[in-house]
Structures are given as C-alpha cells and as structure tokens.
C-alpha cells in the first residue's frame, strides 16, 4: 500500500509506503510501480541509482539538470533524517517560484518524485544521513546547474538552529532571478512529458 500526496509544485508527488515490521526488523518498498503510474501517469525510467551520505548540517542543492534532456528523480532517506525541498524553476509553469518541503527519515521512508525541470535540495538533520536517488538519466557534469538554496526570494524555511555546510559550487550559485536573467532556467513546455501514442494508431480509439 502506498499513500500519495500532490506537492504544491505542479507534477511533483510525495509517496509514503506502508512498513512491515516484526521482531526481525522491517521491510519496505519505497518505490511501487503501480502506485507511481496511478499518480504520475507513466513508469519511472530508472537509468542510474545514486547514494549520498551527509553529516548534520550538510545542505545539498538547489540542483537541476538542463532541459532538454532533463533528469527526473525519485528520492528517499535510507538512514537518518533530512528536510527535502522541491522548487519550481520552470519558466512559464503555473507554479513557478513555488516550493514544497518533505520531512524524510528512515522510519517513514517517505519519498519524493521530482520531474524534469524542478530544482531539488535537502538538508541533513542528523550525522550519517543517507539519501538514495533513482534518476532517469546518467550524470553529465556539463548539464548540471545550481541555484542558491538560501535565496530570500525563494524563501525556503530551513531550520536556523542548524549550521549549514555547503559545497563550493552551491555557495556561489546564482539566485533564482539571476539564473533566469542569464537564461539558465528550463522552459515549462520543454519539461512536459510527450503524449503517449494510441495503442493502435491505424484505427480510432474506442472509449
């Protein structure tokens, strides 16, 4: 069983799986194909899996991939705790500039689907926080970009009691308005999934 919530960002979803526990431990399925297709409308095309481990206070993001080709992500916390952020940076999107936050931990195994063109970040709230990613395309450095995760115009409410640790790249990343002015941001139309062909293109579809 999977519980689904639409994010405040168009096209994004939160998935919370049922957990099966007994005296041995637990078993959980963070990605379930049937539930994913029912929510999103297509299967998740896994091309690569990624794994990160972070100390408390590590803030990774806001990251996005040039679109096209884009990169969709399915992210969950396998160990520790994290605050996950998704920001709509698609120019022309009905939810441009909006964001949503998801509390992630290794107790709920809550996951987030991040479609092409959205920016993603997370803040590790415990040492040895492990995040697992399924992504729709292989990593290509020349396509990867970042936006300042502390941009006041976006206004992500990161907890202030945590001392942030950012990479050199994320520290100097442009703010959203600067990235838009430079033409760095994806266009909403380029991020929409292509329409699926009919099952029998040689004859009309019967409804």
Q: Could you say what each language-model-derived stretch is?
A:
Residues 1-107, 126-128, 138-207:
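Non-catalytic, conserved peripheral segments adjacent to functional cores
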């Amino acid at each position: 069983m999977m519980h689904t919530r639409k994010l405040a960002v168009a096209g994004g979803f939160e998935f919370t799986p049922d957990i099966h526990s007994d005296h041995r431990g637990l078993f959980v399925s963070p990605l379930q194909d049937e539930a994913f297709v029912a929510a999103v409308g297509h299967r998740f095309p896994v091309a690569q899996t990624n794994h990160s481990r972070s100390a408390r206070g590590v803030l990774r993001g806001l990251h996005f991939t040039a679109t096209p080709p884009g990169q969709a992500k399915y992210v969950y916390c396998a160990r520790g705790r994290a605050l996950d952020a998704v920001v709509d940076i698609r120019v022309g999107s009905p939810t441009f500039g909006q964001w949503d936050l998801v509390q992630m931990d290794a107790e709920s195994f809550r996951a987030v689907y991040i479609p092409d063109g959205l920016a993603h970040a997370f803040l590790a709230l415990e040492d040895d926080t492990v995040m697992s990613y399924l992504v729709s395309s292989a990593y290509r450095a020349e396509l990867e970009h970042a936006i300042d995760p502390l941009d006041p115009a976006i206004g992500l409410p990161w907890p202030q009691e945590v001392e942030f640790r950012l990479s050199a790249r994320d520290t100097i990343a442009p703010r959203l308005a600067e990235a838009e002015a430079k033409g760095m941001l994806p266009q909403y139309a380029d991020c929409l999934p292509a329409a699926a062909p009919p099952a029998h293109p040689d004859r009309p579809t019967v409804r």
